[in-house]
Regions:
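Central cavity-lining transmembrane alpha-helices of secondary-active solute carriers
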Residues: 56-73, 268-279
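Helix-loop-helix hairpin linking two adjacent transmembrane segments in secondary transporters
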Residues: 147, 151-193, 376-384
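Helix-breaking motifs and short loop linkers at transmembrane-helix boundaries and internal kinks
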Residues: 80, 102-104, 289, 310-312
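Structural signature of the two symmetry-related core transmembrane helices
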Residues: 84-98, 292-306
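C-terminal membrane-cytosol helix-exit motif in multi-pass small-molecule transporters
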Residues: 182-206, 393-402
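Helix-to-loop junctions at the C-terminal end of transmembrane segments
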Residues: 68-81, 277-289
Length: 434
């Protein structure tokens, strides 16, 4: 029987893979608008403005991830070990990234981004499920926050690396950037080969032991619904707010006189801030009600998105993106912690995939709506709309939470609340008193 390994080592492997993949994704992401500008539009998109084509490219990737994550969540219920799904997704993403070198028109670029989205969709919910399987109930928020920090650091460093590479090779030689990105994504597969099958979990004391039930004493797996509409709407809106800058990347560059490295700094600033904040937020989510953090995150997103639309200088643009990074961390880590309860449940990965798919739906539809809104009503309008939607989403989640508390407080003395009426789970892994 092989010796039991410290689960923190497994968490480190997964986080290292996320860091590497994030660097590659960020490098590719900043390069794509330049490909859109240089490649022929194709007959189908000949009447589309460049901004609309960039928005459509981002949307196609996000929608592919949306549908792919629903499939990945279902696959993880029947395929073991789950790490094989992640390896398959990363390998397919590397292949499609390498093929970007051969893209000769905008439609081909869209097709390859769809394949990339479907490939990465296999990785995201599977990775989150593995993280919760390797972490204990009292440290689940910290584990998710640490991985989020590592992945976000990669996404932040990626645009910086991409800006440097584009400056070195030139905008006419993006094939070198895509080729390097494909190689880095393949490297991200390696840590998964060293992961054991996720049959062990960590008890609250932090030592490995046999698999235990980490659900709450008064809460079965049915107490965590498969779909949480409030958090799903929040994920959609958060992603839409975060993608406003990429949609107007070229416009901001022209308005503020920024080169490719300046845009890279603006893109990375949100991600670097999220990197710094995610782990502390995860630790806080292990100790206080996650909803308080979620409300704060949506308020930060509303203010930063509005400020971004009014940016008339690079410092204001940078400040808006930094505030947005804080908001993204305050929303995403606690929301993921809420849906990651009951790791032994057969629907665990699928429940996570529904939240991550909602975020990908925002990445997919949000930029398209942003571009269309700007074309019809002006540049500032989409920023105002997403700000108001962030505030409305916070109010919606708060309303649902109050209804949940009212229904649970109405349970008979000494009895249990009707779990079918509980719309949102109690903070996963936290002991309750009855």
């Amino acid at each position: 029987m092989p010796p039991k390994r410290d689960p923190r080592f497994n968490l480190g492997l997964i986080s290292f893979s996320g860091l590497i993949e994030g660097i590659a994704a960020g490098t590719i992401f900043i390069s794509l608008p330049y490909s859109v500008s240089s490649l022929p539009e194709g007959e189908l998109f000949s009447d589309w403005a460049e901004t609309s084509r960039i928005g459509f490219l981002i949307s196609s990737f996000g929608l592919a991830m949306f549908f792919g994550q629903l499939l990945a969540g279902r696959m993880a219920r029947n395929i073991a070990p789950r790490r094989s799904i992640a390896i398959t997704g990363l390998a397919a993403c590397a292949a499609s990234t390498a093929l970007l070198v051969l893209a000769a028109s905008f439609p081909q670029l869209v097709l390859l981004r769809i394949i990339q989205g479907l490939s990465l969709a296999l990785v995201i919910p599977t990775t989150a499920s593995l993280l919760t399987a390797y972490s204990g109930p009292s440290s689940r928020g910290s584990a998710l926050g640490f991985f989020s920090s590592a992945k976000t650091l990669g996404l932040a460093l990626g645009p910086l690396a991409g800006g440097i590479l584009i400056g070195y090779f030139g905008k006419e030689n993006l094939g070198a950037v895509y080729g390097l990105g494909a190689g880095v994504i393949l490297l991200a597969c390696v840590p998964f080969f060293f992961l054991p099958s996720p049959g062990l979990t960590v008890n609250p004391g932090g030592s490995p032991g046999k698999q235990t039930d980490t659900s709450q004493p008064n809460q079965s797996s049915r107490g965590s619904p498969l779909f949480n509409p409030g958090l799903a709407l929040g994920a959609f809106v958060a992603a839409s707010c975060a993608t406003t800058l990429p949609v107007f990347q070229n416009e901001f560059a022209n308005r503020l006189g920024l080169d490719s490295f300046g845009i890279a700094v603006a893109l990375s600033s949100m991600l670097l801030t999220r990197f710094l904040v995610s782990w502390p937020v995860g630790r806080a989510a292990d100790r206080i009600d996650e909803h308080r953090l979620i409300y704060a995150g949506l308020l930060f997103l509303a203010g930063s998105t509005f400020l971004l639309g009014l940016a008339v200088s690079f410092p204001v643009l940078l400040l808006a993106r930094i505030i947005m990074g804080i908001g993204m961390a305050l929303f995403s880590v606690p929301a993921l912690r809420i849906v990651s309860g009951d790791p032994e449940s057969r629907n665990h990965t699928f429940r996570i995939s529904l939240l991550t798919a909602a975020f990908s739906c925002g990445v997919g539809i949000g930029p398209l709506l942003t571009g269309l809104c700007a074309d019809r009503f002006g540049f500032v309008t989409p920023f105002i709309c997403w700000s108001l939607l962030s505030l409305a989403t916070a109010a919606f989640i708060s309303s649902r939470q109050r209804k949940t508390e009212a229904s649970t407080s109405g349970a008979p003395p000494g009895g249990k609340p009707d779990l079918s009426e509980v719309s949102e789970p109690v903070a996963a892994g936290r002991k309750t008193t009855g």
